[in-house]
Amino acid sequence: MRKCITFIILALTACSLMTSCDKQTKKADAWDFVITAKEAELKGDQLTLITNSEHLFAFTDRPNRKFASISMEDWTKSWNKGSDSFEKDPPNAVLVGTNSADEKEVLVEIELMSAPVKVAGGYRFQIKRMTGSDHQSVVRMGRSFIYIDNESDTLSIDTL
């Protein structure tokens, strides 16, 4: 009986230690972002999004899926926060839409080099087009989406 009780105590202690270690090493959720726009224009190293929305969507991946709507203002303010900020390590993004000129789908891989700046009717980013992307000097799109991949472990909904 004494051995059985000792075993149970040791097992419970081990489980408790594993749980507390797991909590200490658990990383913050990595949030990805989506901005929708009525129109988009990619011209040189600038991306202009025309949108009525003052918010963007945020979500996490499996296994603990979460989602939220956050203001562009709060997201912009967080651009240079943390040791691994977007300012220090610009995020990859994909711009998806339909080319206004020929109605063909367009997918352009970019890097967002700056926080968005509010302009008449929307927002403007400084961007860098990635290798293999459509390098036309000007691309105009109708309804568009920009998916922003967050590799940062410091930019989180919890910190906004």
Locations of regions flagged by a protein language model:
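Bacterial N-terminal signal peptides that target proteins for export
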Residues: M1-I8
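Bacterial N-terminal signal peptides
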Residues: I8-S16
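C-terminal motif of bacterial Sec signal peptides marking the signal peptidase cleavage site
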Residues: M18-S20
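Acidic, glycine-rich low-complexity segments with interspersed aromatic residues
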Residues: K26-A101
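C-terminal partner/receptor-binding element of secreted or periplasmic proteins
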Residues: A30-A37, L42, V119-L160
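Exposed beta-strand and adjacent loop surfaces of beta-rich binding modules
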Residues: P90-V94, E109, R143-F145
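Beta-strand elements of well-folded, non-transmembrane domains
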Residues: N99-A101, P116, T131
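Short beta-strand-centered aromatic/proline hotspots
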Residues: V106-A115
